[in-house]
């Protein structure tokens, strides 16, 4: 006689075991129609799941995040159903959900074209429109393997052989004649899977291992209703317009090439932005009392063995040999900073020591994961490490948080998601130490009045951490900043200080990054601003142009005046119509265009226009120089008179 407790505390008693869907029907026909699955005692279950004992139950509908994920997972099965009908010889691998959608890896003896993808999507919609029921069946391990052997599915058999215990009872989901294996839950009926779009095909190795066969990965997105799908596709279109790779090429910021995969060739204009970011962060380092250091590019493997990187991180490290010694190019800066700390005896009076570096790091990321500036192999971190006592953790973390928000606000990022990652199961140190560390981070967040999400067990083995994710104008999250406590590395590298009682103690190390990878941050702000960088970051801040050849000398004079006060200025003296020049520099996103005609020469002025088409009128060169200098000095986000 199960008693079901609902989220509002009310209870319903049944005289027999009852399914999730039957409970929903007992509550009301409308809820039953909307039921996708249920959360029974906190665990997601299919709508057909039978509850035999007293339990708590939350009904999952398309309005819930869980409901949307289940829809997406079922759309992956729908994709499998459709592709099997169109290409009977295809071998199905895995089809999980991802952010905003799903994918399925398939093994097919020819490359899928866009026409194929369109046909698969059309068949998916035809199948979904029949509103067929999805039937779940529990079978023995051997029955599951026999099923997939008969169906010629070697990848499903491999999953059973390598990942599922022989005593398990796998769940097979039947989509009419198509069968897939999954932990679930899935939708009870395909009427929930009507709003989807297949997006692209990419290569993916089976098991993510380059030694295995390359499969074709079909990506798709799925939503609860037509409106959500349309809004998402609109956001994708806007994101495509803002793609930093496209804008980077149009603005001649950088390029990448096959001979140096994942490495950036910075062009003059892109490097100008890079250096401006470094200059800005340096002003903040001074303000927050950091010292700036520079560590070596590579170090002997002996050091990396001490840190544990050689044992746990070797696949991501580039190595080289010389004179019978093996070296690793640094993937991170922290071991080098500990070496600097270790030079000379340190006292508790010297702490905290805040050590910052624009460190050039390299990681051997898989080639398939590389993506413009967002995922590279060679990058520069605005990295810092703070050596302090346990008593100083809260105050130092508070200072780090203030610095994070100080810097992000300059770029217009005010919507920041904060996450606190706590102790994992496998960790070093005592529970008391972790209690103090987590309490210190939580207190620092509270001190700054920040709401945060706790990520249980997501901390590193050597300490808890705070993550800061920027939400951009398209609602995407970019995880950039981290404040990470480390109780392990200083001890592994023999870092000590003389405590107040004259004993030797190991300092706590706080890893602190704000921009993270500068390369990636440039990619983020390129997309955030759509290439319309604020004046202080713009590679060229103003272009001075003539109307006819007779104004050329005046244009040169104006440009020199502006350059002499530190502004980045170019001239355009081409024998082209001024409207053509304005259009061209508008496309180049130059903040200000200064037009010099006979009238401006006679008045000793310049006519100023913005890249958004605003006519600001005429100014003396001195007036305009002061306006632009003030904008640069204060790092304003908007141009003059810009909404």
Curated annotation (Swiss-Prot):
This protein's UniProt keywords: Aminoacyl-tRNA synthetase, ATP-binding, Cytoplasm, Ligase, Metal-binding, Nucleotide-binding, Protein biosynthesis, RNA-binding, tRNA-binding, Zinc
Reactions performed catalytically: tRNA(Thr) + L-threonine + ATP = L-threonyl-tRNA(Thr) + AMP + diphosphate + H(+)
Entry's localization field: Cytoplasm
Pfam families assigned: HGTP_anticodon (PF03129), TGS (PF02824), tRNA-synt_2b (PF00587), tRNA_SAD (PF07973)
Cofactor binding note: Binds 1 zinc ion per subunit.
InterPro entries per record: aa-tRNA-synt_IIb (IPR002314), aa-tRNA-synth_II (IPR006195), aa-tRNA-synth_II/BPL/LPL (IPR045864), Anticodon-bd (IPR004154), Anticodon-bd_dom_sf (IPR036621), Beta-grasp_dom_sf (IPR012675), TGS (IPR004095), TGS-like (IPR012676)
Residues at which Zn(2+) binds: 334, 385, 511
Enzyme Commission identifier(s): 6.1.1.3
Keyword Flavoprotein tagged: no
Self-association state and partner proteins as the record states: Homodimer.
Listed name of the protein: Threonine--tRNA ligase
Organism of provenance: Haemophilus influenzae (strain ATCC 51907 / DSM 11121 / KW20 / Rd)
Encoding gene per record: thrS
């Amino acid at each position: 006689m199960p008693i079901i407790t609902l989220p509002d505390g009310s209870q319903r008693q049944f005289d027999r075991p009852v399914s999730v869907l039957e409970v929903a029907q007992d509550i009301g026909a409308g809820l039953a129609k909307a039921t996708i699955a249920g959360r029974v005692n906190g665990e997601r279950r299919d709508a057909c799941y039978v509850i035999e004992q007293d339990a708590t139950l939350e009904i999952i509908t398309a309005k819930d995040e869980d409901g949307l994920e289940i829809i997406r997972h079922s759309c992956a099965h729908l994709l499998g159903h459709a592709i099997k009908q169109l290409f009977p010889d295809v071998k199905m691998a895995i089809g999980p959900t991802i952010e905003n959608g799903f994918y399925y890896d398939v093994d097919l003896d020819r490359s899928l074209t866009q026409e194929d993808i369109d046909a698969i999507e059309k068949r998916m919609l035809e199948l979904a429109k029949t509103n067929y029921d999805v039937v779940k069946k529990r079978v023995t391990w051997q029955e599951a393997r026999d099923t997939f052997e008969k169906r010629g599915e070697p990848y499903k058999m491999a999953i059973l052989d390598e990942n599922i215990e022989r005593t398990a009872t796998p769940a097979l989901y039947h989509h009419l004649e198509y069968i897939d294996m999954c932990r679930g839950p899935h939708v009870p009926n395909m009427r929930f899977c009507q709003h989807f779009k297949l997006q692209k095909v990419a290569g993916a190795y089976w098991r993510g291992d380059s030694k295995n066969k390359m499969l074709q990965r079909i990506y798709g997105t799925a939503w609860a209703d037509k409106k959500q799908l349309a809004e998402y596709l609109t956001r994708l279109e806007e994101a495509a317009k803002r793609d930093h790779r496209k804008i980077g090429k149009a603005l001649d910021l950088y390029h990448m090439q096959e001979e140096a995969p994942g490495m950036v060739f910075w062009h003059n204009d892109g490097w100008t932005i890079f250096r401006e970011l470094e200059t800005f962060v340096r002003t903040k380092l001074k303000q927050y009392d950091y010292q700036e250091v520079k560590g070596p590019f590579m170090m002997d493997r002996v050091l990396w063995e001490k840190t544990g990187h050689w044992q746990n991180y070797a696949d991501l490290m580039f190595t080289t040999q010389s004179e019978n010694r093996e070296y690793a190019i640094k993937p991170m800066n922290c071991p080098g900073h500990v070496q600097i700390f270790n030079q000379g005896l340190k006292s508790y009076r010297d702490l905290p020591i805040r050590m910052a570096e624009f460190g050039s790091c390299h990681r051997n990321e898989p080639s398939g994961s590389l993506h413009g500036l967002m995922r590279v192999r060679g990058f520069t971190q605005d990295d810092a490490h703070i050596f302090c006592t346990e008593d100083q953790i809260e105050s130092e973390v508070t200072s780090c948080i203030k610095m994070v928000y100080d810097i992000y606000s300059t770029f217009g990022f005010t919507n920041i998601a904060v996450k606190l990652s706590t102790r994992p199961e496998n960790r070093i140190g005592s529970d008391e130490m972790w209690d103090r560390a987590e309490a210190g981070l939580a207190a620092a967040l509270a001190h700054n009045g920040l709401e945060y999400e706790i990520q249980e067990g997501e901390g590193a083995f050597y300490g808890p951490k705070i993550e800061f994710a920027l939400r951009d104008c398209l609602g995407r999250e970019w995880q950039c900043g981290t404040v990470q406590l480390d109780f392990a590395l200083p001890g592994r590298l023999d870092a000590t200080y003389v405590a107040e009682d004259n004993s030797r103690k190991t300092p706590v190390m706080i890893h602190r990054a704000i921009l993270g990878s500068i390369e990636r941050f440039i990619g983020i702000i390129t997309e955030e601003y759509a290439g319309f960088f604020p004046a202080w970051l713009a590679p060229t801040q103003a272009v001075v142009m003539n109307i006819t050849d007779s104004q050329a000398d005046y244009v040169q004079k104006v440009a020199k005046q502006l350059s002499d006060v530190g502004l980045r200025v170019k001239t355009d003296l081409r024998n082209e119509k001024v409207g053509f020049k304005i259009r061209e520099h508008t496309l180049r996103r130059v903040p200000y265009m200064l037009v010099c005609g006979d009238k401006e020469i006679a008045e000793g002025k310049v006519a100023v226009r913005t890249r958004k088409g605003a006519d600001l009128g005429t100014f003396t060169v001195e007036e305009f120089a002061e306006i632009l200098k003030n904008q640069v000095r204060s790092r304003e986000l908007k141009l003059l008179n810009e909404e």
